[in-house]
């Protein structure tokens, strides 16, 4: 009896479930290249993430001795989950990337002034993954331009709906 492997979604895409998003990153940075990285986590952190106690809004990534670490992301521990260890909510967590990706990111960060910003934390086939993006900070006038563009798109949609409804 050969059993065909089942696919989670159409076209072989894996099902992912978002744990946390960093919407502020889109507002404060010009996001360019995105990378998917694994996280080196402890057991209590996985339990807390399953309970939805993760926050990546204040986080950023940096390169230290050829490895990339996530700083400032908060995983609030469950009271009953960690009895034998002392949990640290905002500890540095190692990101797992291929060496070629680390080298590419390292050159862009050091030479071109980019920042590594976490944009999403999600499950991918029972593993926690972090999406990080190479980003450059926006100036205040860039933020205002983006807000004007959003308002214009919203007004345009409103006018089109009203026009289509009346016709």
From Swiss-Prot:
<dbReference type="GO" id="GO:0070929">
    <property type="term" value="P:trans-translation"/>
</dbReference>
<comment type="function">
    <text>Required for rescue of stalled ribosomes mediated by trans-translation. Binds to transfer-messenger RNA (tmRNA), required for stable association of tmRNA with ribosomes. tmRNA and SmpB together mimic tRNA shape, replacing the anticodon stem-loop with SmpB. tmRNA is encoded by the ssrA gene; the 2 termini fold to resemble tRNA(Ala) and it encodes a 'tag peptide', a short internal open reading frame. During trans-translation Ala-aminoacylated tmRNA acts like a tRNA, entering the A-site of stalled ribosomes, displacing the stalled mRNA.</text>
</comment>
<keyword id="KW-0963">Cytoplasm</keyword>
<comment type="similarity">
    <text>Belongs to the SmpB family.</text>
</comment>
<dbReference type="Pfam" id="PF01668">
    <property type="entry name" value="SmpB"/>
</dbReference>
<dbReference type="InterPro" id="IPR023620">
    <property type="entry name" value="SmpB"/>
</dbReference>
<dbReference type="InterPro" id="IPR020081">
    <property type="entry name" value="SsrA-bd_prot_CS"/>
</dbReference>
<feature type="region of interest" description="Disordered">
    <location>
        <begin position="139"/>
        <end position="167"/>
    </location>
</feature>
<dbReference type="GO" id="GO:0003723">
    <property type="term" value="F:RNA binding"/>
</dbReference>
<feature type="compositionally biased region" description="Basic and acidic residues">
    <location>
        <begin position="139"/>
        <end position="158"/>
    </location>
</feature>
<keyword id="KW-0694">RNA-binding</keyword>
<dbReference type="GO" id="GO:0005829">
    <property type="term" value="C:cytosol"/>
</dbReference>
<protein>
    <recommendedName>
        <fullName>SsrA-binding protein</fullName>
    </recommendedName>
</protein>
<dbReference type="InterPro" id="IPR000037">
    <property type="entry name" value="SsrA-bd_prot"/>
</dbReference>
